[in-house]
Amino acid sequence: MQTYPFELPKLQYDYDALEPFVSAETMKTHHLKHHKSYVDKLNELVKGDDFLNELPLDQLISKENLSKIDEDTAEKIRNFGGGHYNHTLYFELLSVKPQKPGKMLSKLINDQFGDFKTFEKEFKDKAESHFGSGWCWLVLSKHGLTVKTTKNQDNPINFELCTPIMGIDLWEHAYYLDHKNRKKDYISKIWQKINWKEFDNKVLEAENVK
């Protein structure tokens, strides 16, 4: 996990690779403008702070460490650090050749939701009904898998000990160029490009959190 100075991660695919599901224009704007802006602002914010400079990104935005700094700085770290962390996860979950969930994640989903279709409906319903900018997450904690939404660039790890398995960006910049105000269409399209099999590694990481 990155530490200061933070860098914009290179995508694992070309900007036009997800067309027609996501246009090249949207991908370029999303990655090179929005994501990069969060990285630049985060670097400027934590520059010169020895404590913050040593923290990996996921620890920087964690509940434990946010509680150790002043409220104004903590809010900015949630915004800029969360923006960097959230977008990094988002771009990593997309794939030109998505695969179905692996054995570990499949078992957890079946145990928690009954089957994948039930989980898919709950996730999409929560994402579609979320008001304003934010994110929809699949989170693993000691309580098992849960679907959560957060406002703005907040992440579940700002508030609890958990591991975000995947998250979908609900800000308009993620879909407005392609879908205008049709958020439901965007969620349906992006869902088809999620590489679920990769998340077994995150499930393994989460075992250290539970």
Task: Enumerate the language-model features and the residues they cover.
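Feature for soluble, non-membrane regions of globular proteins
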Residues: 1-210
